[in-house]
Regions:
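Glycine-rich phosphate- or other oxyanion-binding loops that anchor nucleotides, phosphorylated ligands
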Residues: 58-100, 145-148, 152
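Long, low-complexity, intrinsically disordered polar/charged segments
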Residues: 1-8, 76-81
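Short N-terminal secondary-structure initiator segments
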Residues: 42-71, 126-144, 232-237
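Short beta->alpha junction loops
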Residues: 65, 116-119
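N-terminal glycine-rich anion-binding loop in soluble enzyme alpha/beta folds
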Residues: 6-65, 70
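Mixed-charge interfacial surface used for oligomerization/domain docking
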Residues: 2-4, 13-27, 32, 84, ...
Length: 295
């Protein structure tokens, strides 16, 4: 049987569910993590609802990464049906999965291409959709990887953290700062360039946080992403952690304030991210997709 040219592969940090992956004709690696010393796989052995119930019970939660054996076996099986694999994991600055996968791929004779384009969540999902479009155009794995890495700076992420409890637990803020922040109901807004999360603002309410994030997006499309915005390729999505109702409201506010910006998705943040920030988070994610007309 003749092999198909290429398959796009990502991990569950993209927010793409297993059911959606089947519809798209791609492969999604379920990210592993440990809860109370037991291993779980996102969207396979645990649901979002079950995960947040564990968090409410103050379970011990830690993130992990796909094993070498798992990735190598997966690639071996995919290459029985496809000539090439393009793997788009979460940014190398936020997870060791990307660098490790690059090393594992060296033994696959140039048939596995690991992309590091600094993405996470809806921006990562946007990269997957671009990769799918490029594959349909007949581009090779090498060409897809080159394009995604060349355009890796065309994104922005702003996340309002709903509770300081999990930042404190992970050692990202001190106990004193968490106590003061919680007493004042402060909500930090974080951003990332793919290497680490940094605080860009501290606000007193969800309403203020949404306003601040929209302001940040407006600044981005007027400056750093002006050319892409004017071309009509910039997109925006909303992500959240167990905060769907507020996320839908945020979507409506964004569409009202930025009617010319293409809205894409309201998605839950991956459990790997939720481990560190807990429930109640809300995010605005700017991305770029030059091939939306081909979907």
């Amino acid at each position: 049987m003749k092999k198909k040219p290429i398959i796009i592969m990502t991990d569950s940090n993209s927010g793409i569910r297993q059911s959606e992956a089947k519809d798209l004709g791609i492969f999604v690696v379920p990210m592993p993590f440990t809860i109370n010393d037991e291993e779980y796989f996102e969207d396979i052995s645990i649901s979002q609802e079950e995960f947040y119930e564990f968090l409410r019970q103050d379970a011990t939660v830690s993130t992990s990464q796909p094993s070498q054996i798992y990735l190598e076996e997966t690639w071996t099986n995919l290459l029985k049906e496809y000539e090439e694999v393009v793997f788009i994991p979460m940014s190398s600055g936020l997870s060791a999965t990307c660098e490790n996968a690059k090393n594992y791929a060296k033994s696959f004779d140039g048939k596995v291409f690991v992309v590091d384009n600094k993405r996470i969540s809806c921006n990562m999902k946007e990269s997957v959709f671009e990769a799918i479009a490029l594959a349909k155009q007949g581009k090779t794995g090498s060409q897809i990887k080159a394009y995604l890495e060349r355009t890796s700076n065309l994104f922005a992420v702003y996340i309002m953290v709903g509770t300081l409890k999990y930042l404190k637990r992970g050692g990202r803020i001190s106990a004193a700062a968490a106590a003061i922040g919680s007493a004042l109901n402060l909500k930090p807004i974080l951003t990332t360039n793919g290497d680490k999360f940094e605080k860009v603002a501290m606000v007193l309410s969800v309403a203020q946080a949404k306003k601040k994030m929209i302001q940040k997006v407006k600044t981005d499309i007027e400056t750093a992403f002006k050319n892409e915005y004017e071309k009509g390729t910039m997109t925006i999505s909303v992500a959240h952690t167990e905060n769907l109702a507020e996320a839908e409201k945020f979507k409506a506010e964004i569409m009202k304030e930025l009617p010319n910006l293409k809205f894409r998705w309201v998605d839950p943040l991956s459990l790997s991210v939720s481990c560190h920030i807990g429930p109640g988070a809300l995010a605005a994610t700017l991305g770029n997709n030059a091939f939306m007309d081909q979907e």
